[in-house]
Amino acid sequence: MKSYIAKPHEVERKWYIVDAADKPLGRVASQVASILRGKHKPTYTPHVDTGDNVIVINVEKVVLTGKKLDQKLLRHHSLYPGGLKEIPYREAIAKKPEFVFEEAVRRMLPSGVLGRKMLKKLKVYKGAEHNQEAQKPEVLELRY
């Protein structure tokens, strides 16, 4: 019996909506990353983008467990000497919650062309309003 290899033109994409309110950031991000990769489908093929589109709402209400809000730092570098910028997650979530969630998911995806293609299928919104009503997204209940 031969192994099945998905072809890009045969992939059927669905739209899912996830409510991130009062759920841990890492748990939501890992499940969203898995759906973006297509690992929930029996037709998953590592070198083909078989994933679905995901809309995440209420990202400003996401939770970090323990003391991570104050102790964990979001870092980026300006590429100049001494250009390391660090801010605690409490400030980062208050200023730009969409970026914090997208970064968490991006770091869980492959770091190449395919990973960037997968990340384009992620739509993140602060609040419960989104403008993807026409796609008729299914509500996705997360496993944990």
Swiss-Prot record:
One of the protein's GO biological processes? translation
Might you report a single GO cellular component term?
cytosolic large ribosomal subunit
Which Pfam families does the record match to this protein?
A: Ribosomal_L13 (PF00572)
Is the DNA repair keyword given for this protein? Answer: no
Q: Which UniProt keywords apply?
A: Ribonucleoprotein, Ribosomal protein
Note whether DNA-binding occurs among the keywords: no
Cystine connections:
none
The protein's GO terms of the molecular function aspect are:
mRNA binding; structural constituent of ribosome
Family designation: Belongs to the universal ribosomal protein uL13 family.
PANTHER family documented for this protein: LARGE RIBOSOMAL SUBUNIT PROTEIN UL13M (PTHR11545:SF2), RIBOSOMAL PROTEIN L13 (PTHR11545)
Subunit structure as annotated in this protein's UniProt entry: Part of the 50S ribosomal subunit.
Q: What does this protein do?
A: This protein is one of the early assembly proteins of the 50S ribosomal subunit, although it is not seen to bind rRNA by itself. It is important during the early stages of 50S assembly.
This chain belongs to the protein called Large ribosomal subunit protein uL13
Q: What organism does the record attribute this protein to? A: Clostridium botulinum (strain ATCC 19397 / Type A)
The record lists the lineage as: Bacteria, Bacillati, Bacillota, Clostridia, Eubacteriales
